[in-house]
């Protein structure tokens, strides 16, 4: 996805620590941590609820670590973890036992429940100690705390900044840094003991048999020292309504329910207009605006309403490129890659295949080749789903600037949209697979930029055709120019991108500057379906490949075919499975006719649901690409983000694909063409078309009932 750390840098202890590797500090692992998110706040802890002073553990607000340690002891010992529960996306509950306390014997009799609730500026941690001992339990409870106000980029790089000095207050502690803010900790009831130097607060309790002791700790980041780049949405932004799914197979309904809970915590907005909501890309590394990620998440979630798409479009349009800047990658009309606070922007050590170099991204960075055409595609799709016409019309000027960038600036290598990092310290690869080795030949050689990615040509074609339709619909000029560009692009693509192996033809992942096809078989080809760039026979060839065992792991699509020399099921982009990548292919297959497309769609849906079950119905950013026949559940990718916006949004994309729902609110129609719904789906309610809730019911005999929607909307089956 974004700014990935290299293979040598990603090695670390499996416990989540950032231990020293062969090149120094390393990126912490995430797979054994419990996360809660209420953007711009997030917490990461062990399964026992403890935040120990190692790795990425802690409480973060605005990409700063407000707490780097939060450890509970009872009578000098840490409680023993029994279990935990994710409560929505922004809260956790941890259950533990106090070994050796209470009655003698092996049975535990003293328990601690720890409830963590995040808010946009911090968290409230509530503790309940229950005693089932026969006699009064006298206990001394302590919470040991630390704060380093480290930037998330430093933590990700494996650095361990020095802690700040604690100051005692009447009811807790505080830590301050004039440049980064004030962290305030308030305890209820007031602690009996505050050890300022050690960062410890403590209480003494006498707990009668069958009774409880309760206390709480509230933590807030105040006075950040610099204006926040993004904040929580306005309180009157209603959030998401969970679609209700009925099916003989329970997995899809459960995935939708928990995915929406994860999405709630990722909502953010700019301080100037907190009603324009977008989704942060993911926690912990990407809790901010990312052009590509935020666009795709909003696009996949259009069946839940167009409001998120509207906020995403406007937020990005306000930051659309206006000048030329090699350092930031900015160009007139270009949509940005990511935004960070100036003192928290990304700095990582990366590898280009031969040499280590510094990856240092500016606070506002435009190094993405695909966000610009995808912005146009999102505007068009949102219009079809019912985005108000006046709001669409207001965004036609930035749409025109996007298309001008596409034709005049982005399209320059043999007539294809391509990229190259001209700063020397930006992303070497600027598609969605942006790790250093993401674009490689079948024999494992790394391709050289400038590169024209296959899926980007599909986005560009779709954007040009969408732009033409939009300007015509609003009685504006320019449609012929965009259609001519699209036709030429399709002709060039057909002539240059297709390669063959023993199984037949498929599109290369990319073209190098001299036109050489980079011949790896990759999941990128799935993004071409439904864009309009391909004809029916070409779409069928791709559908067959997507269903093959080379790409289809049984848990979803591998990013790189298992037959490639560079395949590694636990690499970032060269063999792993990404839920959103698979969901995009599923959406394209739903728009492709023929038995091959249907078979591949059903298999990929089942694979994603199988994977979701293995992750407790909370799909991570990515996971291992091992074959389902070899494992009963997918292996986690150890540095994978969770929750992650487009992974969670994949659940809604699956639902829409199974329904085959394609609205055209401006045209007054909604098309439904369900794809072998049973056992995955029998009914769905709570979807939204044109601002109105709709429900779809499917019967075994093929009858389709569409309930609700705007007046005058005609059903096409």
Regions found by a protein language model. Give the residues of each.
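Acidic/polar, glycine-enriched structural segments that form the non-catalytic walls/loops
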Residues: 3-7, 111, 119-124, 131-289, ...
């Amino acid at each position: 996805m974004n700014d990935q750390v290299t293979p040598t840098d990603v090695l670390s202890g499996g416990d989540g620590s950032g231990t020293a590797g062969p090149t120094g500090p390393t990126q912490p692992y995430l797979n054994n941590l419990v996360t809660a998110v209420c953007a711009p706040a997030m917490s990461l802890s062990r399964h026992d609820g403890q935040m120990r002073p190692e790795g990425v553990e802690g409480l973060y607000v605005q990409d700063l670590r407000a707490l780097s340690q939060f450890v509970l002891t009872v009578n000098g010992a840490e409680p023993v973890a029994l279990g935990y529960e994710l409560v929505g996306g922004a809260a956790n509950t941890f259950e533990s036992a106090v070994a050796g306390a209470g009655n003698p014997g092996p049975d535990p009799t003293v328990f601690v429940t720890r409830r963590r609730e995040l808010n946009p500026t911090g968290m409230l941690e509530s503790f309940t100690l229950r005693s089932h001992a026969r006699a009064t339990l006298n206990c001394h409870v302590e919470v040991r705390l630390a704060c380093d106000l480290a930037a998330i980029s430093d933590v990700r790089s494996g650095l361990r900044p020095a802690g700040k000095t604690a100051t005692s207050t009447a009811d807790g502690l505080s830590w301050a840094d004039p440049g980064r803010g004030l962290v305030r900790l308030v305890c209820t009831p007031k602690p009996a003991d505050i050890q300022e130097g050690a960062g410890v607060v403590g209480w003494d309790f006498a707990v009668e048999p069958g009774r409880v002791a309760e206390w709480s700790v509230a933590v807030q980041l105040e006075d950040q020292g610099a204006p926040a780049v993004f904040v929580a949405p306005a309180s009157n932004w209603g959030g998401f309504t969970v679609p209700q799914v009925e099916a003989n197979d329970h997995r899809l309904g459960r995935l939708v329910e928990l995915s929406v809970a994860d999405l709630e915590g990722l909502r953010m907005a700019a301080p100037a207009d907190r009603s324009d909501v977008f989704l942060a890309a993911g926690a912990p590394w990407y809790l901010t605006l990312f052009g590509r990620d935020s666009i795709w998440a909003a696009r996949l979630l259009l069946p839940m309403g167009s409001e998120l798409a509207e906020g995403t479009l406007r937020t990005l349009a306000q930051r659309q490129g206006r000048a030329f800047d090699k350092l930031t990658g900015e160009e007139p009309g270009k949509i940005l890659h990511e935004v960070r606070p100036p003192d928290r922007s990304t700095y990582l050590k990366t590898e280009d295949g031969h040499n280590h170099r510094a990856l240092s991204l500016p606070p506002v960075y435009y190094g993405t080749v695909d966000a610009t055409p995808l912005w146009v595609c999102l505007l068009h799709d949102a219009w079809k789903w019912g985005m108000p016409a006046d709001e669409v019309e207001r965004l036609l000027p930035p749409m025109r600037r996007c298309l001008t960038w596409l034709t005049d600036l982005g399209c320059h290598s043999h007539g294809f949209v391509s990229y190259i990092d001209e700063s020397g310290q930006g992303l070497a690869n600027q598609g969605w697979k942006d790790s250093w080795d993401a674009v490689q030949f079948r024999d494992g050689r790394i391709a050289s930029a400038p590169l024209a990615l296959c899926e980007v040509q599909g986005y560009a074609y779709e954007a040009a055709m969408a732009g033409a339709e939009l300007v015509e619909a609003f009685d504006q000029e320019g449609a012929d120019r965009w259609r001519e560009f699209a036709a030429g692009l399709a002709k060039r693509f057909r002539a240059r991108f297709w390669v063959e192996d023993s199984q037949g033809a498929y599109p290369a992942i990319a073209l190098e500057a001299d036109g050489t096809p980079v011949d790896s078989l990759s999941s990128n080809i799935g993004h071409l379906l439904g864009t309009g760039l391909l004809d029916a026979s070409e779409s069928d060839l791709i559908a067959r490949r997507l269903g093959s065992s080379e790409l289809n792991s049984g848990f979803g699509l591998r990013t790189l075919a298992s037959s490639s020399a560079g395949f590694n099921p636990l690499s970032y982009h060269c063999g792993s499975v990404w839920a959103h990548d698979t969901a995009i292919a599923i959406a394209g297959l739903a728009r492709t006719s023929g038995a091959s497309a249907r078979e591949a769609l059903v298999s990929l849906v089942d694979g994603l649901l199988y994977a979701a079950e293995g992750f407790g119905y909370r799909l991570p950013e990515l996971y291992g690409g091992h074959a389902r026949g070899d494992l009963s559940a997918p292996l986690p990718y150890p540095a994978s983000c969770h929750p992650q916006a487009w992974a969670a949004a994949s659940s809604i994309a699956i639902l829409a694909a199974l329904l085959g729902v394609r609205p055209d609110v401006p045209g007054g129609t909604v098309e439904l063409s369900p794809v072998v719904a049973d056992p995955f789906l029998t009914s769905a309610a709570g979807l939204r078309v044109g601002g109105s809730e709709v429900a779809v019911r499917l019967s075994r005999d093929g009858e389709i009932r569409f309930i609700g929607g705007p007046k005058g909307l005609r059903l096409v089956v």
